[in-house]
Amino acid sequence: MRKVFITGTAGFIGFHLAKLLLSEGFRVHGFDGMTDYYDVSLKQRRHQMLMQTPGFSATEAMLEEAGKVSETIAEFAPDVIVHLAAQAGVRYSLENPRAYIDANLVGTFNIMEAAREARPAHLLMASTSSVYGASEDMPFAEALKVDHPLTLYAATKKANEAMAHSYAHLWHLPTTMFRFFTVYGPWGRPDLALFKFVDAILDGRAIDIYNHGEMYRDFTQVDDLVRAIRLLIDAAPALVDARQEAIEGDNLSPIAPYRVVNIGNGQKVRLLDFIDAIEEALGQKAIRNYMDMQKGDVPATWADTALLRALTGYAPRTDFREGVAEFVTWFRDYHRK
């Protein structure tokens, strides 16, 4: 039975990934600090559901606790490490920057140090589409230069990519970084747009729409996203072999078993169309408050998913209208009973 160590299992994406892997017979050990960035009861409920599943165990501790991180990983001896835990959110990084240094830099360093000792077959870590900054070269391909982050959050994730490459090179640790694009779905975070919009519309409150609605996002349904991660677990990078046929667009490092992979839906959706889908699912119109662009935000994101497809055969299954309707059903069941 393969063993996977996942950080952030009480979080949105980590919860869904753990569920998927457990359903396939993996043993999963979760590691989560249960921080109060948002409603802790939502995190606790996710973990309670996982704890009822055979094969799951968990440790509650902070990423910054180096000793606890290394001790837990050494004891579990995972075949694979998936590092998803982080201080998330572009906008919150403007208010509380130190949290991003502690969790995203120090915490990620602790994971990499523990991985260096534990020697898993594959280390996979979350980056973000925010590293592409204000680039207008769309769709965003992994080979694009990402040297101009617009927020500290994006900067810490860019730093994580550089740190991971150095460890992959120095210690021959097969490493994949994934850049996520606007993830949504059931059990989502309260600070994400879909959650906030549905909550406000049901309460009769106005929703803030930035850049006067001229926003586009590559909305990625969470089940599609964790399925992509599952496929990538079995696609560990190896050192370049001149005898192997190169994959077009591959950014595999020439000096390390390391690559970066976008995980997105592969299409950009106008925010106003997304809001229309929410209204349709709710059967209720939104009160729309159009606003200027917010500091640190970008008008559009759009993932080039050709590399992900070439490596794994992945294709998204969820149309955003279906995904929104599914979220609304969950929201009403969980929050509005």
Predicted region positions:
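C-terminal substrate-binding subdomain of Rossmann-fold SDR/epimerase-dehydratase oxidoreductases
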Residues: 20, 61, 201-337
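Alpha-helical hydrophobic/aromatic positions enriched in membrane-embedded helices and signal peptides
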Residues: 3, 24, 31, 88, ...
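Conserved sequence/active-site signature of Rossmann-fold short-chain dehydrogenase/reductase
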Residues: 131-132, 183-185, 215, 225
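Hydrophobic alpha-helix immediately C-terminal to the catalytic Tyr-X-X-X-Lys motif of short-chain
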Residues: 159, 163, 167, 197, ...
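N-terminal Rossmann-like NAD(P)+-binding domain of SDR-like oxidoreductases, especially those catalyzing
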Residues: 1-183, 232, 318, 330, ...
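Short, conserved catalytic or interaction motifs in soluble domains
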Residues: 39, 186, 265
